[in-house]
Amino acid sequence: MPVSGEFADWATELTVRHIPVPVRRATGRRILTAIAGGVGAARVGLVDPAVHVAVGIGGPPEAELIGHAAGRLAAPAAALANGMLIGAARSDPEGVGAAMAVVLPVALAVGQEVKARGDEVLVAVIAGHELACRLAAPDGSRSVGVLGGALAAARLMTLDRDRVRDAVGIAGGFVGEPIGTGGTVGLAGGIAAGNAIIAARLAASGASGPACGLDELCRSWRLRRETVVAGLGAEWACEAHRAATVSDYQFDLETCARLGGSRRDARALVAEVRALAFAPSLDSILALTVKVAAGT
């Protein structure tokens, strides 16, 4: 079976009960780190061009921006801005850190669009991030976030396995290697997040992607298929976290300090993200990012 088929089967059947606690814990920390970075970037206007473009695109009221009271925008536009906000402040030294700056904005945008529960969003983030982690280069040089983002979007849109495979295959057409350094921070991640949602929507509308697209990418990257899919569902490439030795209490305190603004609102935001698996929606989390960014 092609690599994309293996991941499509796995992702469509994945539930929160299948995910070990250490994986959920590590993902929760990455989500907290990403959102805190996005709030900080929003507060200082680090990627205002992305916000202006997203608001200009507008579209149907589907998803909100991190740290901005701009109302609801089309999900691809929101993912573009949120991807740049998270990517601009990324300080995670992990080689796969850039992938979360794509997968999470996609999951937030599509999650709000389809009114997904928190546990559904968490599963989508983990599924997309696991795919990205298995394909990523140690130095982060491969642009794999769009592939994980497409998988997360397709999962939240409840596409069947064939459409999930198509979404990832279409997203493969957006994979490209960096052409240099410099320029506006977070740009690549934001564009990848928007493209991931477009890929999933194309698949949902009947567009097809190359059935063996991931296999071709693996060959071009000199990755063995057996290595990419080995232990899928039993072994987790996304489990390791650089702050694993830090207690949750200390990690949350450090995150509150990074968030700044009202200490009460910062604590509330951390608590909401920690309880993501039990949340009825994402609305309160996005609303709190606006309050924390404004410092009110």
What are these regions (language model features)?
Residues 14-15, 112, 183-184:
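Short coil/turn segments at secondary-structure junctions
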Residues 2-3, 98, 120, 141:
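A generic short alpha-helical patch detector that favors 3-5-residue windows
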Residues 80-135:
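Hydrophobic alpha-helical hairpins/lids featuring a short glycine-rich hinge
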